[in-house]
Amino acid sequence: LLLEGFKGVKGKVESKPPKHFRTALGQMVNFLYTMQGESAGAQAFSNVDTLLAPFVRYDNLNYKQVKQAIQEFVFNMNVPTRVGFQTPFSNITMDLSVPSYYAKQNVIIGGEIMEETYGEFQTEMDMINKAFFEVMMQGDASGRVFTFPIPTYNITKDFDWNNENFSGLWEMAAKYGIPNFSNFINSDLNPEDARSMCCRLRIDNRELAYRGGGLFGSNPLTGSIGVVTINLPQIAYISKSKEEFYKLLNERMLLAKNSLEIKRKLLEKFTNNNLYPYTKFYLRDIYARFKQYWKNHFSTIGLIGMNEACLNLFNEGIGTENGKKFAVEVMDFMRAKITKFQEETGNNYNLEATPAEGTSYRLAKLDKENHTGIICSNDREYYERGAQPYYSNSTQLPVNYTDDLFEVLDHQDELQTKYTGGTTIHIFAGERISNNETMKNLVRKICTNYKLPYFTFSPTFSICPNHGYVVGEHFTCPECGEDCEVYSRIVGYIRPVQQWNKGKQAEFKTRKTYVVEEKTCKVC
């Protein structure tokens, strides 16, 4: 966008490269609105604060003007403009400080290379980030939280924990749970190697290095053509032994591969036939190099219900020693298969912890109807109270397993690092953290002591039509008795619980929230 503007389709309005801050933000909105019409998943912009900071100085904007522009951008990003009256699913990566790979690059204004380098614009970056923090915390006219864009912050080894300019980040995380944190302290990845496309698709660009060279350090142009989710509980229920389980899993993975290969061919055909005109324009350089538009996009295979697979196969969950051992074995099996698929096809494959906002409920419901006796995550509630069934997400522990956060992190650390496509640990808390220092220390402790790549802090809060933000879960306001909207993270994004599907509502009722205390968050 900064080099070429928003254009590329005959007969449609074209924009030149932006020369001003508000124009750049406006083109980002238009781009995401339009691209949501060509793909079903999320879109993301990386290095947003770094790349936009020079516009602030060139426009000679003060803080009030920057905040007004950011406010317009955020409100526009939360308008339901996609099919089904949904809001475009968007993610942005914010650097906070100028990354080394941009520091000495010349800035782009109006599509032209200027004399200054991005490393000279830290003050303007601070203005953008402060404005973004404040806008996101203030919410809309009724105090509701903004769902999009979901901001991702990279926590690196040289992260400046004592920077006072980041105080708004910790407040935003503690009050609403808005940010996603990407852990690079204990990772062998660097931020320039990875890109967060949606709430969890974390792409290892080193797989692309021999194809794209350094291009992808600054310009991702990558993603996923689609996800096929493997129903592990059903395979386990049908199987009578581990050997049969792996045989069926192998068959399902082959089916997933064939499905994704067919889809890739169809996407190439449709793109060549101008059915994805904007995608065709922005991926044209990829096509010029490989004769394929989607060459740098991954075929993604996901999984769901590892805990219930263990229950159906062994009658013990993933929280046991045997259950976790089996989960690690299955993950290694799937990783090996995906590597083989990649070698056979020449296409990129990855393994993802599928978000499964709807799949966890839909598959469990279908399995309960078609497989008598199959175990779901909330079997007791299903039989005793008629609760809607659901499966646990990917290889995660049951949501009511424990209220000890670090017990969960200890258990999940090895499993989380097995995913090559994306995964997230959500730290569900009953209410906000009142102390920003505690929030900061929690993030620091997790990143320092664990290898898990991606996590959020997700407090429950309520919105009263009269009093706005209310701490914790209150379906009626404790002050005035009005009905409240109760907010929590359904999986990747924050939504009112009342709008969740029945399966996820059943999950919310059984969730144990983690106890986060100041003493447990001290950095060791």
Task: Give the location of each predicted region.
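Conserved catalytic cores of very large enzyme subunits
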Residues: L1-K295, E316, T320-E479, D483-V486
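Intrinsic, low-complexity terminal and presequence regions
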Residues: T460-E479, E485-C524
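Glycine-rich phosphate/pyrophosphate-binding loops
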Residues: N312-E321, Q498-A506
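Metallocofactor- and cofactor-centric catalytic cores in central/energy metabolism, strongly enriched
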Residues: V66-I70, V74, N312, K504, ...
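Glycine-centered flexibility sites
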Residues: G302-G305, G421, G492, G503
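Sequence-pattern detector for short linear motifs
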Residues: I203-N205, M306, Q498
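Generic secondary-structure boundary/loop-capping signal
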Residues: A42, L232, K295-T300, V491, ...
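Extended amphipathic alpha-helical segments enriched in small hydrophobics
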Residues: H297, L303-C310
